[in-house]
Amino acid sequence: LNKTETNRVNHSPQQDVGAIYKDLDDVLGETARMLMAVVESEFGKQVNYDDMSAFDLRIACDLNDEEAEVVLKIAHEPNNLLGISPKAGAQSALRQWVEAGHQIVIVTGRPPETRDVSVEWLQLNDLPHHEILLVDKYGRYEVHHCQITTLDELRNRPFSLAVEDAPSMATWLAETAGFTVALLDCPWNRDLVSHPLIR
């Protein structure tokens, strides 16, 4: 990562008690609320946060494929990403884990061109971490891109805990990768099928 990233924590292996996977959007930041604002400004559709019963933006906001693509393109503009509010308690939770000796790995499914602005957002909001991974979670990107981590590479990481909001990703982490998953309570994941590794 950029040497100017002041919130990246120096990793001390002897202190390591397990790496923690921490999703970015809607785990550390209020991304869905920003997306709803974009949907309203572009298409005049008002969607309440608690009514977002699906992770898929097309279903949650009644958008067609083209409209959803427009929303995501606008949402990934630097000014919109930098304007996302951090989740309440996100900073204190990360600090407690770091103080306990955990390595914090921020994992996001954002496109590779958003890496720098994502790092900047973490820095601006004083969110400590050791590493950030841009993962092709949903098969959207060219996996040979030098900044993209594949799911196969991700499953070989030694995470003691993964914190997610996306139901499909939480299921994959538990069933395929065998990680213990803390599923953050969100309207779009409340109907997730139970799994012994998801809590």
Where are these regions (language model features)?
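Short catalytic/ligand-binding loop motif for oxyanion handling, primarily in non-cytosolic enzymes
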Residues: 29-32, 37, 100, 113-117, ...
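Substrate-recognition "cap/lid" segment bordering the active-site pocket of phosphatases
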Residues: 112-163, 167-174
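Acidic, Mg2+-coordinating phosphoryl-transfer loop and its flanking beta/alpha structural elements
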Residues: 158-199
